Amino acid sequence: MIFTEGTILAPSSILKHFNHASYIPIKNAVTKITSWYQQGAEVIYLTSCKKEKHVDKIKELLLMHQFLGQRLYYREKGQKYKDIVEAVMPDILIEDNCQSIGGWWQMCITYVKPEIKAGIKSIVVKEFKGIDDLPYLLSDLINWRN
């Protein structure tokens, strides 16, 4: 599971931070994710958007920029990120550190039940810096240490 905004997508300028329609891929995110997909990874995404029209815009961006993957998850009314992570139970969760909105307490993994968290490889990258530093090989990714 890969978080979209701040992890693989960023605003095209600082003035467009809250305009998700203007977001673009961060560095070589598409190439990296394509590599994982071609190695057999089931690639799924999680967006911060809640409103259907905004979720649809993120979906359009992912398709337009050729991000490969199977599904885009989003929070419905009353849901928290932890609810989605606990329901999906991804092997790997890649997300940014949420620095611009308060840090660790805003992250998806933070409030996941310990027994579920133990089975998830949590990888945290710096917000808006992308995933370029992560390995291309899935076998190396699962052993990656932050």
What residues fall within each predicted segment?
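Alpha-helical substrate-recognition element adjacent to the catalytic core
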Residues: 1-78
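C-terminal cap/substrate-recognition subdomain and adjoining C-terminal extension
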Residues: 54-146
